[in-house]
């Protein structure tokens, strides 16, 4: 998967099309990413008491994972780009922007 935790991405399709956000978590086995402020859902949680007596629960708004094919990585110029790879001088794979050839 070419999108990693900490990348800035833009949503290219779906209800949040055009939204930018930072990848909070990546799920490579499921090909999904959790993006900050994107694909927000309302989750209904059961009301429960904590040990101090306070109540927690109700309707909670949180981000849901979005498929990796619906996002594109934003390069250093702030434009969405595809991701490529090249071998660096130290022999390690380095991610590059396909749009301008710079390192991501």
UniProtKB/Swiss-Prot annotation:
GO terms for biological process: translation. GO terms for cellular component: ribonucleoprotein complex; ribosome. GO terms for molecular function: rRNA binding; structural constituent of ribosome. The keyword Oxidoreductase does not apply. Keywords: Ribonucleoprotein, Ribosomal protein, RNA-binding, rRNA-binding. InterPro entries: KOW, Rib_uL2_dom2, Ribosomal_uL24, Ribosomal_uL24_CS, Ribosomal_uL24_KOW, Translation_prot_SH3-like_sf. Part of the 50S ribosomal subunit. Belongs to the universal ribosomal protein uL24 family. One of two assembly initiator proteins, it binds directly to the 5'-end of the 23S rRNA, where it nucleates assembly of the 50S subunit. One of the proteins that surrounds the polypeptide exit tunnel on the outside of the subunit. PANTHER family: MITOCHONDRIAL RIBOSOMAL PROTEIN L24 (PTHR12903). This is Large ribosomal subunit protein uL24. It comes from Saccharopolyspora erythraea (strain ATCC 11635 / DSM 40517 / JCM 4748 / NBRC 13426 / NCIMB 8594 / NRRL 2338).
